[in-house]
From Swiss-Prot:
Record's protein name: ATP synthase subunit c, chloroplastic
Highest taxon of the lineage: Eukaryota
Transmembrane segments: 3-23, 57-77
SUPFAM superfamilies: F1F0 ATP synthase subunit C
Function: F(1)F(0) ATP synthase produces ATP from ADP in the presence of a proton or sodium gradient. F-type ATPases consist of two structural domains, F(1) containing the extramembraneous catalytic core and F(0) containing the membrane proton channel, linked together by a central stalk and a peripheral stalk. During catalysis, ATP synthesis in the catalytic domain of F(1) is coupled via a rotary mechanism of the central stalk subunits to proton translocation. Key component of the F(0) channel; it plays a direct role in translocation across the membrane. A homomeric c-ring of between 10-14 subunits forms the central stalk rotor element with the F(1) delta and epsilon subunits.
One of the record's GO cellular component terms: chloroplast thylakoid membrane
Recorded family membership: Belongs to the ATPase C chain family.
Location(s) in or outside the cell: Plastid, Chloroplast thylakoid membrane
Subunit comment: F-type ATPases have 2 components, F(1) - the catalytic core - and F(0) - the membrane proton channel. F(1) has five subunits: alpha(3), beta(3), gamma(1), delta(1), epsilon(1). F(0) has four main subunits: a(1), b(1), b'(1) and c(10-14). The alpha and beta chains form an alternating ring which encloses part of the gamma chain. F(1) is attached to F(0) by a central stalk formed by the gamma and epsilon chains, while a peripheral stalk is formed by the delta, b and b' chains.
NCBIfam families: ATP_synt_c, PRK07354.1
UniProt cross-references to Pfam families, sorted A to Z: ATP-synt_C (PF00137)
Remaining remarks: In plastids the F-type ATPase is also known as CF(1)CF(0).
Length: 81
């Protein structure tokens, strides 16, 4: 295996996980904050807000998992070798 390709794959895997987690992390923080504000304003709508929040958090977390899958593919099933 070419050491340059191996080093680039490790760097790309780290960047894939790091950059794929920035957006969902910010989005999850914002969504959770807005949900807490919504529940504080309308406590009777807590169940509906919480259900919607959990569903949206799952969709956002999927983006981070996709970045992890790309990183694992680069590390263990490298297509460039």
């Amino acid at each position: 295996m070419n050491p340059l390709i191996s080093a680039a794959s490790v760097i790309a895997a780290g960047l894939a996980v790091g950059l794929a987690s920035i957006g969902p992390g910010v989005g999850q923080g914002t969504a959770a904050g807005q949900a807490v504000e919504g529940i504080a304003r309308q406590p009777e709508a807590e169940g509906k807000i919480r259900g919607t929040l959990l569903l949206s958090l799952a969709f956002m977390e999927a983006l981070s998992i996709y970045g992890l899958v790309v990183a694992l593919a680069l590390l263990f099933a490298n297509p460039f070798v």
